[in-house]
């Protein structure tokens, strides 16, 4: 089978469709599957269209991202916090509930649209030779700090039973910096890890010894040793990262 894997389209459905088309995706080919690595809606102007497009695909699997958690958290809370405004989450809720005048009206209206879309999302997809996650698999935290937002300079251990990690552990794993965690040797799955979450341009710039997002910025997938990064900073670049792999589902 051929898998078309993307991440972090953030409501830029046109860029997503263009990227899949350029990669050769054929919706009528039963050997073609689409796998999303999370963060589908907020920041872009077309969350409704993104939901409709992804929901229409007959063969797709959607991995949950940290921004997908954020929008559900805000709706459950009933009002936005500061990060909901800066991340575009609050605007996305309003886009999905255009007739609402208050957050009290907007949140339940948006939930009716988002809940069917998010309820089928999974924490990871495991193929015979690849594992697709939003950021990383759950790891054992050794310093007692449960937050995975900052991973540099911290110690972790590979968690052999990561497949059976708790909902809380998976939610935390969606925040880690995947390139840093890969550099710590924490992908001991024996398979190539494919992730989004963290813009590949940061790693390209680090490798090339330059300032990130300068005139040499690269918005494309990053192929490392045992891992592939997909996040092309779509809200900035207008590009969605897609890789095409040939693999099979686990038996």
Model feature map: region roles:
Residues 30, 47-130, 146, 153, ...:
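Active-site neighborhood of divalent metal-dependent phosphoester bond hydrolases
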Residues 2-10, 130-136, 228-230:
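Active-site-proximal beta-strand elements of phosphoester/diester hydrolases
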Residues 108-133, 138-205:
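His/acidic metal-ligating clusters that form di-metal
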Residues 1-53:
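N-terminal active-site segment of His-dependent metallophosphoesterases
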Residues 10-14, 42-45, 69-72, 139, ...:
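Active-site environment of divalent metal-dependent phosphoester hydrolases
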Residues 5, 34-36, 62-63, 131, ...:
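Residue-level marker for buried hydrophobic side chains located in beta-strands
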Residues 178-251:
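Conserved beta-sheet core of the metallophosphoesterase superfamily
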Residues 8, 39, 54, 65-66, ...:
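Divalent metal-coordination and catalytic microenvironments
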């Amino acid at each position: 089978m051929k898998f078309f894997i993307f991440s972090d389209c953030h409501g830029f459905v046109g860029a997503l469709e263009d990227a899949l088309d350029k990669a050769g995706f054929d919706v009528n080919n039963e050997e073609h599957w689409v796998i999303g690595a999370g963060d589908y809606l907020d920041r872009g102007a077309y969350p409704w269209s993104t939901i409709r497009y992804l929901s229409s695909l007959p063969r797709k699997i959607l991995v949950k991202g940290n921004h997908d958690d954020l929008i559900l958290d805000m709706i459950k809370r009933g009002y936005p916090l500061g990060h909901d405004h800066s991340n575009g989450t609050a605007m996305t809720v309003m886009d999905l509930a255009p007739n609402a005048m208050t957050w009290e009206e907007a949140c339940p209206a948006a939930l009716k649209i988002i809940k069917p879309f998010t309820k089928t999302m999974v924490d990871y997809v495991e193929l015979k030779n690849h594992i697709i996650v939003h950021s990383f698999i759950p790891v054992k935290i050794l310093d007692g700090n449960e937050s995975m937002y900052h991973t540099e300079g911290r110690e972790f251990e590979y968690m052999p039973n990561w497949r059976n990690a708790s909902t809380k552990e998976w939610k935390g794993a969606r925040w880690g910096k995947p390139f840093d965690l890969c550099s710590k040797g924490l992908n001991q799955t024996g398979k190539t890890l494919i992730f989004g979450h963290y813009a590949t341009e940061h790693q390209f710039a680090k490798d090339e010894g330059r300032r990130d997002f300068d005139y040499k910025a690269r918005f494309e997938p990053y192929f490392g040793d045992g891992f592939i990064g997909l996040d092309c900073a779509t809200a900035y670049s207008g590009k969605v990262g897609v890789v095409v792999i040939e693999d099979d589902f686990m038996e």
